[in-house]
Amino acid sequence: LMTTEDFMGRYKQLNTKSQDELAKELQVTSEQATILIPCARIYGRFIEVVGCKNLWVPGTDICDGVAMDYAMSRKKIMDKHNFDEDILNEVRGISKRYKGNTVHIQFVRSLAVQIFDVTKKIHGLSKRERLILELAAMLHDCGKYISIHNAAECSYNIIMATEIIGLSHREREMLAQVVKYNTTPMEPETDLTVIKLTAILRVANALDRSHKQKMQDCRFELKDSELVISTKSKEDIALEKGLFVDKAEFFEEVYGIKPVIRQKKFNV
């Protein structure tokens, strides 16, 4: 650990020396001395951009990073780190910042991914789109923190104004559109992937319209031209059924299958 002042002072000293002098003074090979100053310049630029006060020097260097990147691109080694989980954790923080209803969000997210998985042969979307669907479920109500009456537009603006590390600009825009169109009409030129994800999110969100998680045990199954949503819940789900109709109609327009809710009846 060293201060940025110490680092910049040391960098200025080394910058006046030749390659041979650096190799001798620091007891490194000539090859290592060759890249020392360019690397120091990169670190110096990072310090200027970030504005940090201290610099922690790990046991790895830029050469290790270059070698790692090359090996991964050639499938020589596999990185076991789950970068998707990093993105999910970051979005959890965004949701928390805008006072999202955690229980409702997690329930809608669970329903959405179940629908995605059971219909994967129909929509043909990838794991990356599945991740965007999860993120949309986690942020679908963030705009309510700013405005209840204009929540969809506020949600869109929040997402577009927030840099989410791990998502490209196009993916972030796709995420923002799915969240926006969850409750508002779509533009005619809307991307097909956005339409497919929005159809799933609308159905999942409608299944917890009361925010009381009445259908905890629901299961999803494709039968002929229907997406059957079965539940043994003893709760009154009249609200969910009533507000489910138009969401189901849109889903049917997109996928050609009709979502139907089937609640097991209990003898009183």
Q: Where are the predicted features?
A:
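Generic structural signal for residues in well-ordered beta-strands
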Residues: 55, 258-261
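Short proline/glycine- and acidic-rich turn/helix-capping motifs at secondary-structure junctions
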Residues: 262-268
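Low-complexity, glycine/alanine/valine/leucine- and proline-rich hydrophobic stretches
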Residues: 210, 214-259
